[in-house]
Amino acid sequence: MKLIEAANYEEMSQKAADIIIAQVKEKPDSVLGLATGSTMLGTYKQLVEDHRQNGTSYRNVRTVNLDEYIGLSPDHPNSYRYYMNQHLFSHIDIPLSQTYIPNGASDDVEAECRRYEQLIESLGGIDLQLLGIGRNGHIGFNEPGTSFSAPTHVVELAPSTRQANARFFPSFNDVPRQAITMGIATIMKSRHILLLASGTAKAPIMAKLFEETVTTDVPASVLHTHPNVTVIADQDALSLVPDEKRKVYAK
């Protein structure tokens, strides 16, 4: 695990975008694993701006998103398909037919999980997976207690996760209770993982992540066992991580 420190959210976003752009330029048909949420907005904004200014092409890129709420149609304003179209896909030259997100409106969500897992394998696996980290350490929607060997599956969302996402919905009760998520095993097959963290709200879980104890109680801790993980975090998110730890991981 390598740590890249950023002064603030804007710098974190730029550094993340630079890594994604480099990946796409090196391998134009890359498979990118993408994430949603407020942490990613700055990165996607930078990718759109770079595409506009420099013409970086995504014509041959394939994307697979981490997760999707169950019960929301793709055109629902709070679906992750809608988020991705609004913030990235509609502003770059990627064909929508090459962008894949679990179908949360499927009549058979268990079959959809199996289909999605097979889809990722058929694409040759994920070259670069973008991740955020939840306040409870979740990655994707893999909540504490999730098996590290889990493939794509249906998950019951923890109350804390639903509360964190309630600001996007009319009320807490409107937040879906279930989602389809790539499993931890699915994520860990990615060739390179890029985890982003910003803000003081993430400081406690980042301190726990850098304690190095690998446990299902902190799903993100499994990343310590992956050979190629880059963490980009701003000073607020790192405020509880001791300087000596930062130095070790910055090398």
Swiss-Prot record:
Name the catalysed reactions: alpha-D-glucosamine 6-phosphate + H2O = beta-D-fructose 6-phosphate + NH4(+)
Biological process, per Gene Ontology: carbohydrate metabolic process; glucosamine catabolic process; N-acetylglucosamine catabolic process; N-acetylneuraminate catabolic process
Q: Where is the active site?
A: 67 (proton acceptor), 136 (for ring-opening step), 138 (proton acceptor), 143 (for ring-opening step)
Which Pfam family, any one, appears in the UniProt record? Glucosamine_iso
Q: Which UniProt keywords apply?
A: Carbohydrate metabolism, Hydrolase
Signal sequence, start to end:
none
General function of this protein: Catalyzes the reversible isomerization-deamination of glucosamine 6-phosphate (GlcN6P) to form fructose 6-phosphate (Fru6P) and ammonium ion.
- Name-wise, this protein is Glucosamine-6-phosphate deaminase
